[in-house]
A protein has these predicted regions:
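Terminal targeting signals and extreme-terminal segments of soluble enzymes
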Residues: 2-92, 98-175
C-alpha cells in the first residue's frame, strides 16, 4: 500500500493556552485498508502530521535542526485504537504536553471524530532533544524552553488521562 499525495492539516489555535491545540483533517481514500477502515499505519501518519504542526509552535519545527543544530528523536510511543473511522470522515486531534525536563518531552495526542467527538485513538510519545554535532542527548536551547515551559504549566492544570504510562501485556487471572 503506497501513500497518496498528502496535504498538511489545517491547524487552528485558540488564544488561550488552556485550549489545547486542535488540528482538523479528513480520512483519505488511500488510508483505507482491506477491512474497509483506516489502516493502523495511517493513524501513525495522522499523528505525525500533527506532531510537525505542534512542534512548530514549541520552537521545534522543521527549521530546528538547521537553526539550533539539534533535533527531536522519538524514544517510544504507545497508540490506543479505540474506534474505527472510514473514508471521508472528519478527525480532530489535540495535543497535551504531559511533562518536560531539560532534554525530554512527553505528550499525548488525542484523536476524536470530527462530528460527534467520540474518542478514536490516542498516541502517547516520549521524545528527546539530540545534538546533531555528536548525536547525543542535549539540553533544550533556552528559546525552546521559553516556549515549552508556559505550555507545560498550563497543561499541568488538565487531567492526566488514565491511559498515560501504561504497559502492553496480556492480563492473566489467577486460576
Amino acid at each position: 500500500m503506497t501513500p497518496g499525495p498528502l496535504t498538511l492539516p489545517r491547524h487552528c489555535y485558540e488564544n488561550s493556552l488552556m485550549t489545547l491545540p486542535r488540528t482538523s483533517l479528513t480520512v483519505l481514500p488511500e488510508w483505507i485498508d482491506h477491512n474497509g477502515h483506516m489502516n493502523v499505519a495511517y493513524y501513525v501518519l495522522a499523528f505525525d502530521l500533527v506532531t510537525d504542526t505542534v512542534y512548530e509552535t514549541w520552537g521545534l519545527g522543521l527549521d530546528y535542526p538547521e537553526r539550533e543544530k539539534h533535533a527531536i528523536f522519538t524514544l517510544g510511543m504507545n497508540i490506543d485504537y479505540v474506534s474505527e473511522v472510514f473514508d471521508g470522515e472528519p478527525l480532530s486531534i489535540t495535543t497535551q504536553l504531559l511533562d518536560v525536563d531539560h532534554k525530554r518531552i512527553h505528550y499525548l495526542h488525542t484523536m476524536v471524530h470530527g462530528n460527534d467527538e467520540r474518542l478514536v485513538a490516542r498516541n502517547e510519545c516520549l521524545c528527546m532533544n539530540i545534538s546533531l554535532d555528536n548525536r547525543r542527548s542535549a539540553p533544550f536551547p533556552s528559546s525552546v524552553r521559553n516556549k515549552l515551559n508556559p505550555v507545560f504549566l498550563e497543561h499541568q492544570k488538565l487531567a492526566m488521562p488514565d491511559s498515560v504510562g501504561r504497559t502492553l501485556r496480556i492480563p492473566h487471572k489467577n486460576t
